[in-house]
């Protein structure tokens, strides 16, 4: 079970999204000062901000767990237009590692390096594929699968503090660039 961010809910269960823009070169420079990838560095920034806003009585009781979608096209060739990704979790335990930012970056970078290897990702893909191609899951009616998927989704939500996604470099066809201000 992961630490949960608490606070007031918005009316009608609406989400509040904060968008920001930064010069990626400057952020990359900063991440390289820590010998970290951009994703590891920004994940550590997210974790640090969660810790900074965390009530004192909650610090160290539960780990902070970040869910990160991984673009599998970076690891395996694919011509599919469909989503080709899997999910990985990184975890930071304040009790074990403390609140030093440099330590956070190092711990997160180490976890990502070990989890983002083709062999490990293949294991995850195999697990997903085995469930999808299982005879029992194919014959169970959709309404029953939906029921159990909702339960699984709620249970997995307990294991996550936040989600962070770095979609990476997006290249569009040259003729489209004049219509795009930013991503």
Say what each PLM segment does.
Residues 4, 38-46, 59-65:
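Short, structured secondary-structure boundary patches
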Residues 36-37, 99:
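A generic structural signal for alpha-helix starts
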Residues 1-36:
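Flexible, P/S/T/G-rich "lid" or insertion loops adjacent to the active sites of thioester-utilizing
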Residues 27, 38-50, 108:
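Structural preference for long, well-ordered alpha-helical segments in enzyme cores
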Residues 19-22, 28, 51-183:
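Acyl-thioester-dependent acyl-group transfer interface
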């Amino acid at each position: 079970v992961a630490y949960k961010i608490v606070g007031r809910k918005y009316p009608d269960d609406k989400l509040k999204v904060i968008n920001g823009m930064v010069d990626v070169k400057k952020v990359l420079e900063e991440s390289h000062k820590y010998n970290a990838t951009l994703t590891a560095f920004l994940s550590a920034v997210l974790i640090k901000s969660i810790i900074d806003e965390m009530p004192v009585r909650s610090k160290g009781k539960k780990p902070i767990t970040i869910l990160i979608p991984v673009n599998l096209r970076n690891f395996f060739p694919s011509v599919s237009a469909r989503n080709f990704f899997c999910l990985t979790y990184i975890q930071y335990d304040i009790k074990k590692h403390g609140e030093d930012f440099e330590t956070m970056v190092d711990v997160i970078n180490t976890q990502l390096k070990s989890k983002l290897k083709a062999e490990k990702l293949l294991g995850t893909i195999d697990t997903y594929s085995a469930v999808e191609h299982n005879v029992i899951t194919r014959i169970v009616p959709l309404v029953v699968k939906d029921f159990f998927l909702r339960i699984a989704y709620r249970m997995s939500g307990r294991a996550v503090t936040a989600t962070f996604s770095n979609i990476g470099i997006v290249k569009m066809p040259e003729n489209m660039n004049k219509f795009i201000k930013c991503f």
